[in-house]
Curated annotation (Swiss-Prot):
Membrane topology of the entry: Multi-pass membrane protein
Record key words, sorted: Cell membrane, Disulfide bond, G-protein coupled receptor, Glycoprotein, Membrane, Receptor, Transducer, Transmembrane, Transmembrane helix
Signal peptide: none
GO cellular component: membrane; plasma membrane
SUPFAM superfamilies for this protein: Family A G protein-coupled receptor-like
Membrane topology, Extracellular segments: 1-26, 78-98, 159-187, 251-271
Protein name, as recorded: Cysteinyl leukotriene receptor 2
Localization in the cell: Cell membrane
Coiled-coil segments on the chain, per record: none
Length: 309
């Protein structure tokens, strides 16, 4: 669903989008790569250090970090493609995998964040009734279901690879021959991949606020659990609003208002910017681990203390 690409005939028109992509994408992708690789790579290391003491929350966070790290590893290839002026040199299957990885990461991230918020809320509002749902074993099963569902539903992207034009090889570009199918896929992804999880996340936010206002709990343990639940949902909401909402909104507008005879440079540039915001979700998730992870700060202190000995 590479809706941020440009049709191959754009280079024959007086459009500025290609120059914008060449100047904008490489530097932003490389910044996201460095920041995201360090943050998620170190987070994975921290989660694995005390895996035997893991909780369901950390299982979801570990899978989220793995998804981000796998996607981050593809960004240098995207940066190279745009730096060369939209010329792909890494082969057809690599092109397919690059497009596929973007959407697998985006929607696994959305679902992991949503499930994290649900688990945090249930553990706070119904701690004893929901023990079987919030167990580590249940968390791994649910993570497996999410991975299989997202990877299978994104499988159509593996059908579309590189395209030869003159002396260049295009990748990530709109396929006008299958434009109607692309619009349909966008609406499905918008509904199932974004609006439904966002609705669930909003409900969790309202319910946890209700729980916090309903009764004052003096004990430090329950209070800490409620604080972490609220922190998880608030950070997830910020990531949704900052990274995923602009991209899904602009992607839909871009497809609905598509005009083959117009450059639509301003709209296209805005869509390009929102794609990098969506990719940047991988940089923000480590903040979630630090502020809302189970014993994440304590593990960090233990690791650094061990290094100084």
């Amino acid at each position: 669903m590479g809706v941020t690409g440009t049709p191959s005939y754009y280079s024959d028109k007086n459009c500025t989008i290609e120059n914008f992509k060449r100047d904008f994408y490489p530097i932003i992708y490389l910044i996201i790569f460095v920041w995201g690789a360090l943050g998620n790579g170190f987070s994975i290391y921290v989660f694995l250090q005390t895996y035997k003491k893991s909780t369901s929350v950390n299982v979801f966070m570990l899978n989220l970090a793995i998804s981000d790290f796998l996607f981050i590893s593809t960004l240098p290839f995207r940066a190279d493609y745009n730096f060369r002026g939209s010329d792909w040199i890494f082969g057809d299957w690599a092109c397919r995998i690059m497009s596929y990885s973007l959407y697998v990461n985006m929607y696994t991230s959305i679902y992991f964040l949503t499930v994290l918020s649900i688990v945090r809320f249930l553990a706070t509002a119904h701690p004893f009734q929901m023990l079987h749902i919030t167990s580590v074993r249940s968390a791994w099963i649910l993570c497996g279901i999410i991975w299989v569902f997202i990877m299978a539903s994104s499988g159509l992207l593996l059908k579309h690879g590189q395209e030869k034009k003159n002396n260049t090889t295009l990748c990530f570009e709109l396929n006008l021959q299958k434009f109607k199918n692309l619009v349909i896929l966008n609406y499905i992804a918008l509904g199932v991949g974004f609006l439904l999880p966002f609705f669930i996340l909003t409900i969790c936010y309202l319910l946890i606020i209700r729980v916090l206002l309903k009764v004052e709990i003096p004990e430090s343990g329950p209070r800490d659990a409620q604080r972490k639940a609220l922190t998880t949902i608030v950070i997830a909401m910020i990531i949704f609003l900052l990274c995923f909402l602009p991209y899904h909104a602009l992607r839909t507008i871009h497809l609905v208002t598509w005009d083959a005879d117009s450059c639509m440079d301003e709209l296209h540039k805005a869509t390009v910017i929102t794609l990098t915001l969506a990719a940047a979700n991988s940089c923000f998730n480590p903040f979630l681990y630090y502020f809302a992870g189970e014993n994440f700060k304590a593990r960090l202190r233990a690791i650094f203390s061990k290094d100084h000995l």
